[in-house]
């Protein structure tokens, strides 16, 4: 299959790197021809002379453009093949209005971890997408991480939980590292300690059968240091703050 990418930002580039492990041919079209050629050379893929030329040559078109650019970029383009969009807030219905509602349309929501081929990606599709095409789309998303079938009505929630949450996790890691610095551990070493601990904690959760609550109980000895810290986190409203940030993220996604 020949896959064309309109828009080649960081996320599209990460996905292309994942696809380079597959047998698919890749063609790209960016904001300008010189830019497209520059990126194509780095990624070892083909550059199209224009968006329409890319469309005419592709079996599947991936839209890697920002949501606010959809109307401008898609105006005047004529599609004849399945389209896959990764834009936050752009529904399948809106995508159909901007392209062709009779085409097979697929929507995905990857996250930044696609850069290391470990994205957590949501996928949904309209009723024009065959089982075979959906399987191909999942093969694409699996090439740069793991894929979850998510109803489109839950995409904004998924965006918050998987798309935006890495930033919140990085903020938490940064805060823990700063606490280490406060008590005398150099920043680089403190950050390494915290990052390794977060990574191992996530792996422990994935590989075992215990819930987060179970693991918290195992770490929290009666009258110990961990329970003292946990109670202080709740005193300052950690859970409420996290849920509130998810609320804000979902509301922003709906407004796009």
Regions found by a protein language model. Name each.
Residues 15-18, 33-34, 40-43, 47-123:
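Rossmann-like NAD(P)(H) cofactor-binding subdomain of soluble oxidoreductases
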Residues 26, 36, 54, 186-194, ...:
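Small-residue helix-packing motif on alpha-helices
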Residues 165:
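Aromatic-residue-lined binding/catalytic grooves and analogous aromatic/hydrophobic interfacial grooves
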Residues 195-256:
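NAD(P)-dependent Rossmann-like dehydrogenase/reductase catalytic/cofactor-binding core
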Residues 1-4:
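Extreme N-terminal starter segment of soluble prokaryotic enzymes
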Residues 12:
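Catalytic nucleophile loop
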Residues 94-104, 120-158, 170-209, 252, ...:
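Internal alpha-helical scaffold of NAD(P)-dependent oxidoreductase catalytic cores
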């Amino acid at each position: 299959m020949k896959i064309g990418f309109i828009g080649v930002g960081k996320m599209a580039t990460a996905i292309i790197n994942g696809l380079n492990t597959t047998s698919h041919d890749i063609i790209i079209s960016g904001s300008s021809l010189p830019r497209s050629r520059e990126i194509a050379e780095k990624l070892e893929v083909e550059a199209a002379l224009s968006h329409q030329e890319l469309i005419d040559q592709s079996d599947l078109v991936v839209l890697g453009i920002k949501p606010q650019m959809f109307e401008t970029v898609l105006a005047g383009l004529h599609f004849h093949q399945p389209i896959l969009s990764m834009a936050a807030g752009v529904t399948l219905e809106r995508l159909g209005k901007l392209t062709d509602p009779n085409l097979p349309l697929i929507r995905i929501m990857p996250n930044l971890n696609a850069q290391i081929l470990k994205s957590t990606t949501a996928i949904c599709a309209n009723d024009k997408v065959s089982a075979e095409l959906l399987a191909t789309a999942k093969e694409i998303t699996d090439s740069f991480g793991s894929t979850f079938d998510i109803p489109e009505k839950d995409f904004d929630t998924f965006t918050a939980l998987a798309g935006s949450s890495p930033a919140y996790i990085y903020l938490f890691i940064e805060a823990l590292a700063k606490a280490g610095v406060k008590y005398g551990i150099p920043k680089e070493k403190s950050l390494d300690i915290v990052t390794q601990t977060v990574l191992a904690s996530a792996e422990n959760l994935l590989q075992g059968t215990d819930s987060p609550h179970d693991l918290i109980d195992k770490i929290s000895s009666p009258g110990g240091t961990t329970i003292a810290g946990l109670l202080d986190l709740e005193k300052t409203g950690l859970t409420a703050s996290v849920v509130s940030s998810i609320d804000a993220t979902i509301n922003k996604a709906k407004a796009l």
